[in-house]
């Protein structure tokens, strides 16, 4: 059954082979995708059943299989690591365009979990782009480099339980300056990836300038997951699933203090 399903998915996903709606894909991107497809065949698809059995076992909540890191090391060895960063993010980018990256993601997405093996999954992917573009050298050294190396994971906290969070200007979590620190108070939920022990920090959106016009009231700040006053109150279910090992967290910030440099 697994082979039949995988075969059907692969048949439907071939845009990287040639042109995409008139957009040409470089020979380099095609070559990378060929290696990526070979990796999926050799290392990912044979582990699909193992992954499902491991993550569906309640005794393994918020843990990763023992073989997980071995696959990540193999992806690094084959230079299939951090492929998602567009070329403007030098020196960390492999130098691909967004068009070229799109086809690679199509291949990775034939497995629900394989993007993690290539260090290309959300929310880490988005957080790495934010830190690469806007982070200070100190922030990049402390948070971006370990993320790029796959040593840690991260979360992005935006959605709130008490407001219509599809409009980001509604966010109410308070970010107040107190000397050399910012103090955070509020709630977030559906905070993807926050429950896994490997998650070491979050990018948190909150209201830092309530007196400003509506679209300039908010800021994003780095908050370590071990910060005093930060609590994960429960794991949320999506479509009945806990989505271990990353999880979806209902979280509270109660007088959480972080340096202004964050």
Where are these regions (language model features)?
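Amphipathic, small/basic residue-rich leader segments at the start of a protein or domain
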Residues: 11-122, 138-149, 153
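Short Ser/Thr-interspersed hydrophobic loop/turn segments at strand-loop and sheet-helix junctions
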Residues: 79, 104-110, 205-207, 223-228, ...
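Structural signature of FAD isoalloxazine-binding scaffolds in flavoprotein oxidoreductases
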Residues: 95-107, 167-170, 252, 257-258
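FAD-binding core of FAD-dependent oxidoreductases
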Residues: 114-128, 149-157, 187-202
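Short Gly/Pro-enriched turn/cap motifs at secondary-structure boundaries
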Residues: 162-166, 193-197, 210-212, 239-247
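Flexible, small-/acidic-enriched active-site or ligand-binding loops
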Residues: 170, 228-257
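A structural signal for short hydrophobic beta-strand segments in well-ordered beta-sheet cores
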Residues: 173-176
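A short core secondary-structure module
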Residues: 180-181, 185-233
